[in-house]
C-alpha cells in the first residue's frame, strides 16, 4: 500500500500497515534484524554513509531497520514528520530535552510529573546549569508568568501522573509560541495518539514511554520522540547517539510494532472498562474522591471532551484514612497487580505515597498535589466484573 494512500486510511489501518519495509524473502511479518553492525560494499560506501551522503545503516545505535519501521509507524499515527526511538521513556525524554537546552537556559514544566521525569528536571538538569520552574499547568496564565527571556522549553504531561490533572494543550502552545524560541513538549503516554494528538493542537514535540500502551503487554522498556524532521535528526545523531546512548533494541522495536497493530481495539476496551470501574469507585463509601476524565464530576470534564477522543484508562482516587488506608488496600487485593507502570493487559494498582513517590519529601509530594491516600489504577483488559469484585473486596476492608 502506498504511503500517500495509507495516510488517508483509518487509524487501525495505519497502525497495522504503517512503516512497512521490504525484505528479501517476502515475509508478511517484519523480520528481526538482530545485529550490532552492518557491512559496507566498499570503503567508499562506508565513507558516504558516515558523511550522510548516502542512506543506509552503519551501527544499530545509529539506526536499525526494525527501529526505522516502528518510528515511521508512530510518526504516522501522531501526525509528525519523523520519530526517534529510545531504550526507555526516560531515555526518550532526556535525549529530547538535552538537544533543546544548554547551560543558562530555562524550562517551564508542570509541577505534577512522573517521578523520574520530575527527578531529571529538578535534580538532574540543575547540575548542568539549566533552571526549571514548576507551575500548575491547569492554569495557562501560570505558564505565561513563568516564561523568561532564556526559556527554551515548556514541558507538559496531560493527564498528569499520578493525579490525572489535564492541561489545555492548545492554550499553553498559543502562549508559548508568542515567545521566540520556546518549544512545547508533551508526554502523550497516558493517551496514545488514538485518544489525543498534541501536535495537532500546536505542540512541537511529543514523547512516549512505549513501555505502556503502545506496546501494551508489559514485556518491553522503550520510548519515542516525535516532531519535525530536522529536530528528530538532532535527537538521533546528538541526543541518542552521543549524549545518552539510549537506543532501542531491534527485538524491542519488533515487539512494539506488533503491539501497536492492536492499539485501537485495546484502547477502546481499556477505556470501556475504566469508565465502568470509575463509576463503581465513585459510589463506594471508602472512597473520598475519584479523578477520571470520563466522569461528569471530574473538574476538567469539558476540557477532556475537547482534546481527548476517549477518557483513557487511568484512574486516580483517594481513599479515606490516608497513607495507612492506602497501604491496607494494596495488601487486600488478589486480581489487581500491585505494580508500577501502566498500560498493560493486566490491571495494575499502586499507592504513590508509599511506593513510586516515596523517595520524595512530603513537601515535594504536597507541592505536586499527591495526597497520602491517593491511589493510581491502570485498568486492564480483564472482565470488568472481576476487576470490580477485587476492588470491592479491598475497599470493603477499609470500612
Swiss-Prot record:
Catalytic activity reported: L-methionine + H2O = methanethiol + 2-oxobutanoate + NH4(+); L-homocysteine + H2O = 2-oxobutanoate + hydrogen sulfide + NH4(+) + H(+)
Cofactors demanded by this protein: pyridoxal 5'-phosphate
Organism superkingdom: Bacteria
Binding site for pyridoxal 5'-phosphate: 59-61, 89-90, 209-211
GO molecular function, a single term: homocysteine desulfhydrase activity
Disulfide pairings: none
SUPFAM superfamilies in UniProt: PLP-dependent transferases
Disruption phenotype annotation: Cells lacking this gene show a marked decrease in the formation of methyl mercaptan from L-methionine and decreased virulence compared with the wild-type strain W83. The hydrogen sulfide content in the culture supernatants of mutant and wild-type strains is similar.
Modified residues (N6-(pyridoxal phosphate)lysine): 212
A Pfam family per the record: Cys_Met_Meta_PP
Family annotation (Gene3D superfamilies): Aspartate Aminotransferase, domain 1, Type I PLP-dependent aspartate aminotransferase-like (Major domain)
Range of residues in the leader sequence: none
GO cellular component: cytoplasm
CDD domains documented for this protein: CGS_like
BP GO annotations: transsulfuration
Coiled-coil annotated spans: none
Family note: Belongs to the trans-sulfuration enzymes family. L-methionine gamma-lyase subfamily.
Function in brief: Catalyzes the alpha,gamma-elimination of L-methionine to produce methanethiol, 2-oxobutanoate and ammonia; methanethiol (methyl mercaptan) is considered to be one of the main causes of the oral malodor in periodontal disease and may also play a role in the pathogenicity of P.gingivalis in that disease. Is also able to catalyze the alpha,gamma-elimination of L-homocysteine.
Subunit structure of this chain's protein: Homotetramer; dimer of active dimers.
PANTHER family to which the protein is assigned, alphabetical: CYSTATHIONINE GAMMA-LYASE, TRANS-SULFURATION ENZYME FAMILY MEMBER
Protein name: L-methionine gamma-lyase
Organism of this sequence: Porphyromonas gingivalis (strain ATCC BAA-308 / W83)
Gene it is expressed from: mgl
